């Protein structure tokens, strides 16, 4: 038995790590598998202070994001992507081997992975689906019943991997009836959504946390910058377990520039283009055997097919990557397709038509 096998924490023996799009798939010239933006925008970086450690929390960055979100800067915590925010919440609120979090599958995989990494239990309350498009919604009654034994409740809206937004009345019902649980609403895709954010509810609900990111609509997945929005006492607690230098200085510089007025105007234009492209792709794929699983409020589409693995392999062999979601509860033979540039989408449409011809 190796030294690692002897000394590792026992629960990690059974842990399956999160299979990110970049980790699980490689190669390809067209990447439509990670819900990234096709835009690569230009920024400037001052390298004169790269010999110095960055701030624990950048006041200019947190202030800029607070203004963007319409809240006070004291309610903002910047982190290495929203994934770090997920981990911080579990570390700060959950006792290993004792507490649980609640998730609503099919949903983003990092909620469960982060919990299991720290020996925290995971309670699943699946989304309700009547079989109709865009009808995946919260089972509020079951969530409220289970919340008594769960420290943290993770809700993803708009949903990844489904794409649709959760009913805000249902989210508020969970908040109202789960006052002893932290209710986390992951709004990674909110810039694409026609629905309302719940950020304005922070004043009303001391147990509400909202996760945000610059990885999607802001087209900055490569700088790893996310935000956790919550009331001051939650922010103060999370700062106790946050790494001393969470964001590199170049990340902070770029993020601040991305939140300036001119950059936000560019973001709105790019989002509008991507939404138009999404609708164009959806219309084109109506001519194929693919079945839309859920109406999208994001920059991706979710489709059922006869053989997801075969379809993904065929496209991969032709240097085009999409994501197989078959491992998710209720999504057997389902693929997720990120909306790319017009040229990338044209290639996608053509390859899918060729595959099904």
From Swiss-Prot:
Residues with PTM N6-(pyridoxal phosphate)lysine: 216
Database matches in CDD domains: AAT_like (cd00609)
UniProt keyword list: Amino-acid biosynthesis, Aminotransferase, Histidine biosynthesis, Pyridoxal phosphate, Transferase
Catalytic activity from the UniProt record: L-histidinol phosphate + 2-oxoglutarate = 3-(imidazol-4-yl)-2-oxopropyl phosphate + L-glutamate
Keyword Isomerase (UniProt): no
UniProt KW Amino-acid biosynthesis keyword: yes
EC number(s) from the headed UniProt entry: 2.6.1.9
Necessary cofactors: pyridoxal 5'-phosphate
Pathway membership: Amino-acid biosynthesis; L-histidine biosynthesis; L-histidine from 5-phospho-alpha-D-ribose 1-diphosphate: step 7/9
Pfam family, one: Aminotran_1_2
Gene Ontology biological process terms in this record: L-histidine biosynthetic process
Record Gene3D superfamilies: Aspartate Aminotransferase, domain 1, Type I PLP-dependent aspartate aminotransferase-like (Major domain)
Superkingdom field: Bacteria
GO molecular function, one term: histidinol-phosphate transaminase activity
NCBIfam families registered for this protein in UniProt: hisC
Record family assignment: Belongs to the class-II pyridoxal-phosphate-dependent aminotransferase family. Histidinol-phosphate aminotransferase subfamily.
Subunit (UniProt): Homodimer.
Record protein name field: Histidinol-phosphate aminotransferase 2
Lineage, uppermost ranks: Bacteria, Pseudomonadati, Pseudomonadota, Gammaproteobacteria, Alteromonadales
Record gene name: hisC2
């Amino acid at each position: 038995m190796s030294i690692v096998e002897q000394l590792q924490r026992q629960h990690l023996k059974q842990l399956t790590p999160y299979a990110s799009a970049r980790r699980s798939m490689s190669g390809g010239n067209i990447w439509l598998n990670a819900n990234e933006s096709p835009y690569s925008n230009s920024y400037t970086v001052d390298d004169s202070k790269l010999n110095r450690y960055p701030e624990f929390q950048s006041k200019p960055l947190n202030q800029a994001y607070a203004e963007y979100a319409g809240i006070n800067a004291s309610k903002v915590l910047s982190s290495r992507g929203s994934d770090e925010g997920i981990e911080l919440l579990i570390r700060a609120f959950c006792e290993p081997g004792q507490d649980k979090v609640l998730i609503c599958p099919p949903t983003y995989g990092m909620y469960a992975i982060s919990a299991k990494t720290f020996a925290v239990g995971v309670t699943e309350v699946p989304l309700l689906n009547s079989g109709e498009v865009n009808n995946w919604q919260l089972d509020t009654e079951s969530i409220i019943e289970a919340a008594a034994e769960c420290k943290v409740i993770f809700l993803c809206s708009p949903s990844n991997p489904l794409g649709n937004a959760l009913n805000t009345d249902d989210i508020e019902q969970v908040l109202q009836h789960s006052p002893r649980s932290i209710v986390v609403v992951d709004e990674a895709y909110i810039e694409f959504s026609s629905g309302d954010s719940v950020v304005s509810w922070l004043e009303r609900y001391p147990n509400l946390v909202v996760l945000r990111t610059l990885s999607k609509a802001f087209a900055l997945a490569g700088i790893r910058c996310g935000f956790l929005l919550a009331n001051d006492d939650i922010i103060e607690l999370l700062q106790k377990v946050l790494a001393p230098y969470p964001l590199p200085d170049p990340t902070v510089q770029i993020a601040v520039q991305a939140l300036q007025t001119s950059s936000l105007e560019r973001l709105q234009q790019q989002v509008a283009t991507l939404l138009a492209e999404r609708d164009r792709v959806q219309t084109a794929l109506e001519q194929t055997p693919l079945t839309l699983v859920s109406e999208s409020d994001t920059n991706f589409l979710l489709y059922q097919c006869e053989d997801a693995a075969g379809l993904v392999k065929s496209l991969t062999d032709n240097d085009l990557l999409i994501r197989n979601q078959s491992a998710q509860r209720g999504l057997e033979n389902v693929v997720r397709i990120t909306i790319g540039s017009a040229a990338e989408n044209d290639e996608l449409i053509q390859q899918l038509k060729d595959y099904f011809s």
